[in-house]
Amino acid sequence: MSGTKIHPTALVEKGAQLGENVRVGPFCHISSEAVIGDECSLTSHVVIMGKTMLGAKSKVFSHAVLGADPQNNKHKGGATILSIGKNCMIREGVTMHRGSDSSTGMTVVGDNCQFFCYAHIAHDCHVGNHVTFANNAMIAGHVTVGDYVIIGGGAAVHQFVRVGHHAFIGGVSALVGDLIPYGTAVGVQAKLAGLNIIGMKRAGLERQDIHALRHAVAMLFDHSKPFKERVNDVASCYSSSRSVADVVRFIKEEGKRFYCTPKFGGDRIK
């Protein structure tokens, strides 16, 4: 705990593990099972409950509550975990719940993520690296969010939904189906509105790869033949495309929800 400073009004329970150069501000409460990495900063009135691990160089702002019990009626009170990666920014009023003992027992957040005011992560979610949640964005239990995803303000994601890497969810959208990698979803209920071209360029994808994915997505959702056949056709036609391979892999993994499709994409695809 070399260099660590704890405000006299803060409550750090016996057994809590604090790294070096940690800053704990006024009226914070840290549980006995918490593990706080080096150079973390808790500004004031931060509550860290249960077995919560906060990665190095993360900053948590006022009235955030991390590691509370899951909002899951099947949870029986067993020991579960919230694991947050390094260099995350967690703004005012953010809530993240531990996993539930009826499921994986873990809620996992990756490195270099940003969670703006009042964002919410429910039990048993897995959030990747470099993810951004805008104000009041929220995901229900068991949701998987890939790397570099951006979720707009006030957007909500249904339980068990998968969000592919580099996807974008527009503000005040309600996503109830799996969103393919690089996809953009907007509206209530959210529909696939195209590709996250800006995100693809940031990921270093070449122009031809972006064009390939555009054509591949059109093939996937044209309803000219059974969905599995369309997936195989796309995989065969665009076998050299990195982005198309990502989408095909995502689809073949198969989640518990149907897919987020274009507005005129016909019936639900599972």
From Swiss-Prot:
Pathway note: Glycolipid biosynthesis; lipid IV(A) biosynthesis; lipid IV(A) from (3R)-3-hydroxytetradecanoyl-[acyl-carrier-protein] and UDP-N-acetyl-alpha-D-glucosamine: step 1/6
Compartments it resides in: Cytoplasm
GO cellular component, one term: membrane
InterPro entries reported in the protein's UniProt record: Acetyltransf_C (IPR029098), Acetyltransf_C_sf (IPR037157), Hexapep (IPR001451), Lipid_A_LpxA (IPR010137), Trimer_LpxA-like_sf (IPR011004)
Top-rank taxon: Bacteria
GO BP, one annotated term: lipid A biosynthetic process
GO molecular function, one term: acyl-[acyl-carrier-protein]-UDP-N-acetylglucosamine O-acyltransferase activity
Keywords from the named record: Acyltransferase, Cytoplasm, Lipid A biosynthesis, Lipid biosynthesis, Lipid metabolism, Repeat, Transferase
Family note: Belongs to the transferase hexapeptide repeat family. LpxA subfamily.
Assembly mode: Homotrimer.
Task performed by this protein: Involved in the biosynthesis of lipid A, a phosphorylated glycolipid that anchors the lipopolysaccharide to the outer membrane of the cell.
Protein known as: Acyl-[acyl-carrier-protein]--UDP-N-acetylglucosamine O-acyltransferase
